[in-house]
Amino acid sequence: RSDALKFLCQYYLNKGDYSKTITYAEIMKNVADKTKNPLLQLYSYIYQAQAQMMSGREKIAKKNLNLSLELATKLNNDSTLCSVYGSLGLYSANIETDYYRAIRWLYKGIQLAQQNNFQQQYALLLGNLANIYYLKKDTAGIKYALECYELGHSMRNPYIIYSGAVNSAYMYFLMKQNEEAMKYIHEAETLMLENDFYDQAHTYNLFGNILYDMGEYAQALEYYKKAMKDKQAAQTSSIVYAHLGYARILMQQNKQPEAILLLKQGIAISYARVNAIHRNELYENLSTCYEQLHQYHDALKYYKIFRLENDSLFNKDKERDLSEMRFKYDSERQENLIKQSKLDV
């Protein structure tokens, strides 16, 4: 029974049906209490926390994350500890927009997964890590995305291949290598449609971004519209990002008043669903719109908010810590590869 409950929680979580995930996680908690099963209790905390976090219920999500961290540490269960570290990383990124803390949690999970040879968790954490690097606009994330992609293929795991492909595509887009990005995004789209993966807006946004870069505004617009249609079955950050993409095209077409409405809509969604990812860019473009309309008072007002949001995201001291962590990851990975090749010989 407990395996069936775990399967259902994971299934609905992957589909983005958070209320069903929470329902089954609560049933799991009741079963765990009755049968005095602490491991099952731990899983119920993890699933509840992930679903609550993704549906913008940040306070209760944090409480369940803390409970899972405490219990996983007490039970000395490395596999669930990897999941908890991963979830804490996503919480830091989505709710607190603290990308540095997010990366620290993800590195912790990656190290633990590496030590225990948890290949699947290791690959998924790499995909999440690459995504945070994209949000930081830092191309150093390419190696994590490609490693996730290669592991997905060697494990023949469609979801991990998809995660690796979509994150590699975002990275190549950041590096202005659009042809390479297109190669990976097409593979991601095929897998996403074959398996009906959740958050398809994330993939459509990148198609939109690449086409926008190429000056193909009409085609780009179609993809942003597709992404915005996905409201119920997409992550908040993807929906917000689609608003940003759509607004940038309207700005190109000198339709600033319409762009302003879309940007304000995106900001409203990001506050309503408690997810600050991309909010800084919405404010930046809002300021630009008002500037283009010669409404300098509003332009300045939104520019100040943009600066506040932006300054809290990027920090020189934290960048230094980050490069040290990256160096550590690289050297540990080298050691593991050397060990592995000695075993293979």
What are the language-model segments listed below?
Residues 2, 7, 22, 139, ...:
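Hydrophobic positions within repeat-based interaction scaffolds
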Residues 3-14, 40-54, 79-95, 106, ...:
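Conserved alpha-helical positions within TPR/SEL1-like repeat arrays
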Residues 4, 18, 34, 78-79, ...:
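Coil residues (strongly favoring Ser/Thr
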Residues 15, 35, 55, 75, ...:
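Structural motif corresponding to the intra-repeat A-B loop/turn of tetratricopeptide repeats
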Residues 18, 38, 58, 78, ...:
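TPR-repeat structural position
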Residues 26-33, 66-76, 107-117, 146-156, ...:
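Amphipathic alpha-helical segments of tetratricopeptide repeats
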Residues 35-39, 75-79, 98-99, 116-119, ...:
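Inter-repeat boundary and helix-capping residues of tandem alpha-helical solenoids
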